[in-house]
């Protein structure tokens, strides 16, 4: 902003005896403080932006407004004085308006330079004095009102005399009154329209106020962010050793800065758009107000002229009547006229003065409140305009009433004169009556009627008084002209302030852009610093030199701040003097106001009543506006809900990926369990090789185990299928939800674009916020993937990639703001890609399912092969039994004696064979049943696959709809793809392991078959042992058959339960599908109703637009009364329509809310159903776990020996001893760490105390400097200042610099000592940590040795248990003892893990203490450096003031001596800075330069 001051003034010269005035053209330079004067106006090409450029041949000289101490106005000849240190400029203008223009312009320029200062306390005194003056004015107004009331009473007493004559002419007056009422109705209608506009302006001002408050908050946030950036830079310079930690801190801070800056940019853009629109509306309305006010003023002037003409005719008629009546009536009429004129003039003057006072109060508040209270200024200015408009309207109404009264009086008096001419006798009688009444009421009037001589004397006195009052009126007219000029100047000030606000907004925008550029530069600098960290480690010596250079830079900054402090002190002194002048001027103006305001009180009561009416009307319109705002808030809440839904969708995607990972982990665990079961089978087969008698039993056991495993695998397959189904159903439901939500979003966006065209900027801001949030989510996903990978080596590369991504994102945001149309196209393309990626993921899931199915098929084929092998074994057994029978028959023939015995034995053998055959037949039938069941399940799988294919088709259709939105999920999907690829690779590895295990099992089975064949040959050799084997086989076969039957029953029960659960799950799925259909229908209905509501909202907006247009037409066509009435009727009809539409909207909103409640209830039912499903799945899992436990109990019945107990007890004792050692070591390490931390805290507290003492020393130095400056400024002459200041300054500067260097060196030394102590502590801690780790490793190795020994013992016991048969009770006791000991071992392992965790926590605490210590050191060093900079700035300001004081005094002396003085002071000051000359030599150097 720039202030304009231009024009001709007469300037008095300073040379010569006779000082004449010369006409000079004055113009204010662009810098706002150099007032140049010329012989004629300079050409436009010449720029006078500064004093150095203006020192050319064109400019005769200039006046520095910053150094002006006072402006005095001389009484006569339009002369005023401008005082500057060392000189007084005597200037003369042509009239008072030019004087006021130049004085107020200079004051405005001074205030413009004082706005940015923070001296608010000085101006509080002015506000208090003005408040006191206002209170005094109110008291004086009360006195004037009392006098006015007395005069009114007198006037009323005189009016009673003429009431008899007025009764005749009441009819004529009533007609005129009706006409006046019609006019008043028109005015009231206009006033109402004005009030409505005023309320809208107030609302706009409130919006501006809120927006500017938010802007101030964001400015504060920007300042905080810049401070954080400085802290980060200092941390980089100081902590070059901690590279990894610094990188992490820099990443976090950069992310936060970018997020906050993006938000601030968006909000500032919105605020600027709102402010621009509101300014335009406000300017239009102000122009309308001004036009209406001018129309009303013209009407009032016409009415006043008519009334004056009537009064003149009345006076002429009165002069023709008798002398007595003429004298009385002339006196009365003249007094009335004078009083009315005085009241009117006083009202106008008082209103203008009140306006000036209010404007000046606003100016003072503007000076007190800096940038944060600028917004409140606009509100106050608008409120003042509204008050003035209301006052003007009230005054207009009052004047109308008075004009009506005067018209009535004039009519009455004209009729009185006519009656007097017609009947003089009646007049005489009436005069007698009037004289009698006057004698009773007024002694003065009785004396006038009785004594003509006294009346003549009184007439002469009255004439003298009239002359005096005419002189007063002339003076008041002059004052009114001055007030009008002041009003014009105040209006110019308002315009200037509006321009200031716009310029400030532009400056803030520029600052934001600068901040963005600074942040980008910081990012580039950070990337460069990361590359240079390794170089800094190698070049520690060069870093110390850089620190010294930085200290020199800090000292330069301190000098600059000292210069600023000096300039601030000079401005404070100048302000004090200017404030005193302002107080004097205000006191003078207030005295004049007190003289003018003595006859004005009745108008205040009427104004108050009308103000109350206006306030009531304003409240009614405020309520209507609040209703509209509530509607807008509801729309905004809907937008926020849509944003929340998008965020929930993203979170659901992440959760689904996590669930897939967990399921894959569970599958891997199940595979491991299966591998362990296979190994247990191998051990059981090896154990059964020793006993040939139990071959049949072992075969049956293997068959049972295979069947159980088949069942387990079938259950697992079913679980996989169910899990896949549930996951697919969940995905489908989520996709449906997403589709519905996206449809709602699309419809809401379309409706909002139609309804809220004026709020496009806010929607752009919302889009940018969503983009920032998605960027945050992307960054979080990237960070999570980095943590999973745990690859710290790739951090530097990833940082570079992130920086590039951030830059690309910034460019994308800028492009999106410029081209919104391109966004939609890019969204569609990206969503198409998303759809393809989702299809790929679904294909991958299908491949996984197919792989699982293929693995299950392979397992089934292998089981079938094993079953065939078992059948071959049974057939071999049958063949061997047949051979035995043939041999027995041969022996029968050879041995006749033993036939009977052999027959008996043969019968027994035949029975056994039959039993075996029956058992084998049963087994075969069961195997056939199992195969049938497998085929049924295969059919189920095929049907399930077909259903999956159908669902896939549906999903593809749904995904085609999703292609329209969700551009921002690309990066998330890429991360998920990478994780899925890794999981797939892990699955492939595990599948390979499973295949290897299966091959190993096949090889082991082949070996077993070969061994079995060998042992069958041995059976033929051992015929003698057949009898014993038969007996044992009988007993064992019975036991095994009973067990087998029990197992079959359990299996059948469990299968029945599983079938029941499957049926229940199917029913629940049907219910779920039905509920989903209902939800979809409800959502469609809701969409339709939302469209209807949007259409109705559009209608309401159209109607509002029509209303606004009609109101504008009413304002334009104020003269046409009939048109106004028609428009009013139309407005009322439109308002009724609006109310009806609003009621319909409310009803539809209620219906929508009810449907939303129904949807929520359905969702709750769906949740309950899902919970029931989860409970049933848990029951299935429990059944399966129970079955697994029963099998494990059968396999875990093994024999153990008492020797194991002794060894385990010894192991227990050793472990306890080592635990005690670990505990003692950890306590010692913890105590050492605590003692070291206590030492560090004590050292930090000592350092804090030292810093506090140093800050006190610095504050004392500042006080000494200020006191010395005050003492020197109070000296009388400039020469004494030269002698006294220069040596003190040199000494003080040297002392301060020495003290600063000493303080900095001490701080450096103490920082180095503390860092060395911290390094020593860290080394000790690392040593203790390494020792503890070595001890823990030793303990773990010993524990592993014990475990290996226990395993070997277990294997030996197993082999021995085959040969021995201990009692079941002893076995159970030994098993219990072993299980207890294993639990104890596990507890010990847990304790070791907990202790290792505690050690890690201690390490983390120590690292945090180190970080906090470095942060505290940096903060304190920053504080000390800031204080040093402030001291240096003060010193620089003192130097600058000293230089300019000497240079100006020498320049004045040289001018008196006749030197040329062509050299500018500012150039000399720039040279002396670079030369480094002592203070003592400055005057000599300056004088030499001036002489050149």
Curated annotation (Swiss-Prot):
LRR repeats: 123-144, 180-204, 258-284, 329-351, 352-375, 389-413, 439-462, 519-543, 551-575, 579-603, 632-656, 728-752, 806-830, 831-855, 895-919, 927-951, 955-979, 1013-1036, 1044-1068, 1138-1164, 1210-1232, 1424-1444, 1445-1468
Regions of compositional bias (Low complexity) in chain numbering: 1274-1286
Pfam families: PH
Lineage: superkingdom: Eukaryota
Domain PH as annotated: residue spans: 2-111
Keyword Lipid metabolism: no
Region of interest: Disordered: 1272-1292
UniProt KW keywords: Leucine-rich repeat, Repeat
Keyword Repeat: yes
InterPro entries per record: PH-like_dom_sf, PH_domain
Listed name of the protein: Putative leucine-rich repeat-containing protein DDB_G0290503
Organism: Dictyostelium discoideum (Social amoeba)
């Amino acid at each position: 902003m720039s202030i304009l001051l231009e024009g001709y003034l007469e300037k008095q010269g300073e040379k010569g005896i006779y000082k004449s005035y010369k006409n000079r053209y004055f113009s204010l330079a662009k810098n706002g403080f150099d007032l140049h004067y010329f012989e004629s106006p300079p050409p436009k090409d010449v720029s006078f932006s500064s004093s150095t450029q203006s020192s050319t041949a064109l400019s005769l000289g200039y006046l520095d407004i910053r150094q002006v101490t006072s402006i005095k106005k001389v009484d006569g000849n339009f002369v005023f004085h401008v005082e500057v240190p060392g000189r007084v400029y005597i200037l003369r203008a042509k009239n008072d308006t030019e004087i006021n223009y130049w004085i107020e312009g200079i004051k405005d320029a001074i205030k413009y330079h004082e706005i940015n200062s923070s001296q608010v306390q000085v101006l509080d005194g002015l506000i208090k004095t003005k408040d006191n003056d206002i209170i005094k004015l109110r008291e004086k107004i009360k006195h004037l009102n009392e006098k006015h009331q007395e005069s009114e009473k007198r006037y009323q007493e005189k009016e009673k005399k003429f009431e008899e004559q007025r009764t005749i002419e009441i009819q004529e007056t009533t007609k005129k009154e009706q006409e006046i009422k019609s006019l008043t109705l028109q005015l009231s209608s206009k006033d109402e329209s004005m009030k409505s506009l005023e309320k809208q302006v107030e609302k706009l001002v409130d919006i501006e106020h809120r927006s500017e408050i938010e802007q101030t908050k964001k400015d504060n946030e920007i300042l905080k962010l810049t401070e954080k950036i400085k802290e980060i830079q200092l941390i980089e310079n100081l902590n070059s050793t901690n590279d990894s930690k610094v990188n992490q801190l820099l990443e976090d801070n950069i992310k936060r800065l970018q997020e906050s800056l993006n938000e601030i940019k968006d909000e500032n853009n919105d605020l600027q758009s709102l402010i621009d629109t509101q300014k335009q509306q406000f300017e239009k309305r102000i122009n309308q107000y001004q036009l209406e006010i001018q129309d009303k003023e013209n009407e009032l002037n016409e009415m006043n002229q008519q009334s004056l003409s009537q009064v003149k005719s009345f006076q002429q008629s009165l002069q023709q009547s008798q002398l007595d009546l003429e004298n009385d009536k002339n006196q009365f009429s003249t007094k009335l006229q004078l009083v009315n004129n005085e009241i009117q003039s006083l009202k106008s003057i008082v209103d203008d003065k009140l306006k000036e006072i209010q404007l000046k109060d606003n100016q003072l508040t503007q000076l007190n409140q800096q940038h944060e209270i600028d917004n409140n200024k606009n509100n106050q200015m608008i409120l003042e305009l509204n008050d003035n408009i209301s006052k003007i309207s009230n005054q207009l109404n009052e004047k109308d009433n008075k004009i009506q009264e005067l018209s009535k009086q004039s009519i009455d008096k004209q009729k009185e004169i006519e009656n007097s001419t017609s009947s003089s006798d009646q007049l005489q009688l009436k005069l007698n009556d009037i004289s009698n009444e006057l004698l009773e009421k007024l002694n003065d009037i009785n004396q006038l009627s009785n004594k003509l001589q006294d009346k003549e004397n009184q007439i002469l006195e009255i004439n003298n008084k009239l002359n005096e009052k005419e002189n007063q009126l002339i003076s008041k007219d002059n004052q009114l002209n001055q007030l009008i000029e002041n009003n014009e100047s105040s209006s110019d000030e308002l315009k200037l302030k509006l321009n200031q606000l716009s310029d400030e907004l532009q400056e803030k925008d520029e600052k934001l852009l600068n901040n963005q550029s600074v942040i980008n530069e910081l990012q580039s600098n950070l990337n460069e610093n990361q590359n240079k960290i390794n170089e800094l480690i190698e070049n520690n010596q060069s870093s110390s030199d850089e620190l010294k250079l930085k200290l020199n830079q800090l000292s330069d900054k301190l000098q600059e701040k000292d210069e600023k402090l000096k300039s601030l002190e000079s401005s404070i002194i100048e302000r004090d003097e200017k404030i005193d002048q302002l107080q004097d001027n205000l006191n003078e103006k207030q005295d004049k106001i007190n003289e003018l305001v003595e006859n004005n009180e009745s108008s205040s009561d009427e104004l108050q009543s009308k103000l109350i009416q206006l306030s009531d009307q304003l409240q009614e319109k405020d309520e209507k506006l609040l209703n509209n705002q509530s509607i807008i808030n509801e729309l905004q809440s809907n937008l926020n809900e849509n944003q929340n839904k998008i965020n929930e969708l993203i979170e659901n995607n992440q959760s689904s990926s996590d669930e897939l990972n967990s399921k894959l982990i569970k599958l891997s665990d199940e595979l491991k369990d299966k591998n362990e079961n296979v190994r247990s089978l191998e051990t059981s087969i090896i154990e059964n090789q020793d006993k040939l008698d139990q071959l049949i039993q072992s075969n049956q056991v293997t068959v049972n185990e295979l069947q159980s495993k088949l069942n387990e695998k079938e259950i697992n397959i079913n679980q996989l299928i169910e899990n896949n189904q549930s996951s697919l159903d969940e995905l489908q439901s989520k996709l449906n939800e997403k589709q519905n939500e996206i449809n709602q979003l699309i419809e809401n966006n379309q409706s909002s674009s139609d309804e809220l065209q004026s709020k496009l900027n806010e929607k752009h801001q919302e889009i940018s916020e969503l983009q920032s949030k998605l960027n945050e989510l992307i960054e979080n996903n990237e960070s999570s993937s980095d943590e999973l990978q745990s690859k710290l080596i790739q951090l530097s590369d990833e940082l570079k990639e992130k920086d590039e991504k951030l830059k690309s994102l910034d460019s994308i945001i800028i492009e999106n703001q410029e081209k919104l149309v391109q966004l939609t196209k890019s969204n569609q393309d990206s969503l198409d890609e998303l759809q393809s990626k989702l299809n790929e993921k679904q294909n991958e899931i299908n491949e996984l399912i197919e792989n699982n199915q293929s693995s299950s098929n392979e397992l089934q084929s292998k089981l079938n092969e094993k079953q065939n092998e078992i059948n071959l074994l049974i057939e071999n057994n049958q063949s061997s039994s047949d051979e035995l029978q043939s041999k027995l028959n041969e022996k029968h023939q050879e041995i006749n004696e033993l036939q009977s015995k052999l027959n008996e034995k043969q019968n027994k053998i035949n029975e056994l064979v039959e039993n075996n055959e029956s058992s084998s037949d049963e087994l075969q039938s069961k195997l056939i049943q199992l195969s049938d069941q497998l085929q049924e399940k295969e059919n189920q799988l095929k049907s399930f696959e077909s259903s999956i294919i159908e669902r896939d088709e549906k999903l593809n259709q749904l995904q085609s709809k999703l292609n329209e939105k969700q551009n921002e999920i690309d990066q998330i999907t890429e991360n998920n793809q990478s994780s899925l690829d890794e999981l797939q690779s892990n699955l492939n590895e595990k599948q390979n392991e499973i295949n290897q295990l299966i091959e190993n099992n096949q090889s082991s089975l082949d070996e077993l078959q070969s061994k079995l064949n060998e042992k069958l040959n041995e059976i033929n050799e051992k015929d003698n042992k057949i009898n014993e084997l038969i007996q044992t086989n009988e007993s064992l076969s019975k036991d095994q058959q009973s067990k087998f039957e029990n197992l079959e029953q359990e299996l059948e029960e469990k299968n029945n339960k599983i079938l029941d659960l499957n049926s229940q799950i199917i029913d629940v799925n049907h219910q779920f599908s039905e509920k989903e259909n209902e939800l979809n229908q409800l959502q469609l209905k809701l969409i339709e109703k939302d469209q209807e509501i949007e259409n109705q909202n559009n209608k309401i907006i159209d109607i509002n637009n029509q209303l606004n247009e009609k109101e504008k037409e009413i304002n334009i066509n104020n003269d046409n009364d009939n048109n106004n009435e028609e428009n009013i009727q139309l407005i009322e009809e439109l308002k009724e329509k609006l109310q009806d539409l609003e009621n319909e909207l409310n009803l539809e909103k209620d219906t929508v809310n009810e449907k939303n409640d129904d949807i929520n209830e359905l969702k709750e039912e769906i949740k309950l159903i899902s919970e029931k499903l989860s409970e049933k799945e848990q029951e299935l899992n429990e059944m399966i776990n129970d079955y697994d436990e029963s099998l494990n109990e059968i396999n875990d019945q093994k024999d153990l020996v008492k020797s194991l107990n002794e060894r385990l007890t010894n192991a227990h004792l050793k472990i306890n001893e080592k635990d005690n050692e670990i505990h003692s070591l950890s306590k010692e390490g913890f105590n050492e760490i605590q003692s070291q931390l206590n030492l560090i805290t004590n050292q930090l507290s000592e350092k804090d105390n030292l810093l506090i003492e140093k800050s006190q020393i610095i504050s004392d130095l500042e006080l000494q400097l200020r006191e010395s400056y005050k003492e020197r400024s109070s000296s009388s002459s400039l020469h004494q200042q030269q002698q006294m200041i220069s040596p003190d300054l040199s000494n003080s500067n040297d002392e301060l610099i020495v003290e600063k260097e000493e303080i900095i060196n001490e701080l450096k030394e103490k920082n180095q000592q503390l860092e060395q102590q911290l390094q020593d502590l860290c080394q000790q801690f690392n040593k203790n940590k390494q020792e503890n780790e070595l001890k823990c490793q030793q303990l773990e190795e010993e524990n592993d040795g014990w475990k290996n020994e226990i395993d070997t013992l277990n294997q030996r016991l197993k082999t021995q248990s085959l040969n021995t048969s201990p009692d079941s009770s002893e076995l159970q006791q030994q098993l219990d003892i072993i299980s207890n000991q294993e639990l104890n071992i596990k507890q010990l392992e847990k304790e070791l893990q907990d202790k290792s965790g505690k050690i890690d926590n201690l390490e983390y605490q120590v690292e945090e203490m180190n970080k906090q210590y470095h942060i505290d050191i940096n903060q304190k060093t920053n504080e000390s450096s800031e204080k040093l900079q402030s001291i240096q700035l003060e010193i620089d300001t003192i130097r600058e003031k000293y230089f300019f004081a000497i240079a100006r005094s020498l320049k004045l002396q040289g001018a008196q001596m006749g030197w040329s003085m062509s050299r500018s002071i500012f150039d000399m000051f720039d040279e002396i800075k670079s030369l480094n000359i002592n203070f003592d030599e400055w005057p000599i150097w300056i004088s030499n330069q001036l002489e050149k």
